[in-house]
Amino acid sequence: MSEPDVKSHKIEFPCDDYPIKVIGDTVVGFKDTVIEILSKHAKVDLSTLAERQSKEGKYTTVQLHIVAESENQLHDINSALRATGIVKMVL
């Protein structure tokens, strides 16, 4: 039996509709902090904004789309978000 043909899914830049999901502690201003950081690094489409809290209310998820220009830009966004201390994961 042969291995299935698995293709690597590479992002083609620029990507005008790149989804970002940020998970972090539920604190006052979490959504605004995420938007502020993303806006410093990329064009943000606020019409795609979605916010949700975990069942217990401990974590908040903010989702939206940005214009992704490069791998370096995505790395910088991840680093800036994680540096806040309130962001647990960036997907």
Curated annotation (Swiss-Prot):
Family annotation (InterPro entries): UPF0250_YbeD-like, YbeD-like_sf
Matches recorded under Pfam families: DUF493 (PF04359)
NCBIfam families found in the cross-reference section: PRK00341.1
Family listed: Belongs to the UPF0250 family.
Annotated GO CC locations: cytosol
Organism the protein comes from: Pseudomonas putida (strain ATCC 700007 / DSM 6899 / JCM 31910 / BCRC 17059 / LMG 24140 / F1)
The name this protein goes by in its record: UPF0250 protein Pput_4677
Classification via SUPFAM superfamilies: YbeD/HP0495-like
PANTHER family: UPF0250 PROTEIN YBED (PTHR38036:SF1)
